[in-house]
A protein has these predicted regions:
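Ribokinase/PfkB-type carbohydrate-kinase core domain
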Residues: 1-102, 134, 164
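Conserved post-catalytic alpha-helical subdomain immediately downstream of the catalytic base
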Residues: 80-84, 106-166
């Protein structure tokens, strides 16, 4: 939300979303367009929160949180009543936390052509998996596979191979 108008619009949409809707918040910190208040406000609406290994440093500072990345993730998960917290560490690994479980997967080694869109592909595949009844672990595996594939193609919207669809 880069302007007060867009922020109010997003909040209005979140308030009107059915309680059954899965509300996803990718913190996606850019420039000067965020502060602790904005992040907290959207976390209060979120069911799923995605943060990467760079963004967690900023959130840790803004929220005055101490501890390891895992401790910060678990604190946010509990404090905001999230169903899932997705933590991505680029070419190294990703972890998805729920109140009851943790799913850790190393990032597959692929010939990287372009990383643009990999995070969004990860998010989309994970949410799709959850919404279609997959377990957190199954949805996580799909998310890792799809995002790795995206990295092997130029551009953010590569044509998916049949084995990646559904």
């Amino acid at each position: 939300s880069r302007t007060p108008v867009s922020r109010r619009s997003v909040v209005r949409l979140l308030e009107q979303a059915p309680s059954s809707a899965l509300k996803f918040f990718d913190v996606n910190l850019r420039g000067r367009y965020y502060d602790a208040g904005l992040i907290r406000e959207f976390l209060n609406y979120a069911d799923v929160f995605k943060i990467n290994d760079d963004e967690i440093l900023t959130v840790r500072r803004l929220f005055s949180l101490a501890g390891s990345d895992e401790e910060v993730c678990r604190t946010l998960l509990a404090e905001y009543g999230l169903r899932y917290l997705i933590f991505t560490a680029g070419e190294n690994y990703s972890v998805i936390y729920s109140p009851q479980a943790r799913s850790y997967l190393p990032t597959p080694k692929v010939e990287v052509v372009d990383t643009v869109g990999a995070g969004d592909a990860f998010s989309g595949a994970f949410v799709y998996g959850i919404l279609t009844g997959k377990t957190m672990e199954q949805a996580h595996r799909d998310a890792v596979r799809v995002s790795a594939f995206v990295c092997t193609r130029p551009g953010a919207w590569p044509a998916y191979t049949p084995d990646l669809k559904g």
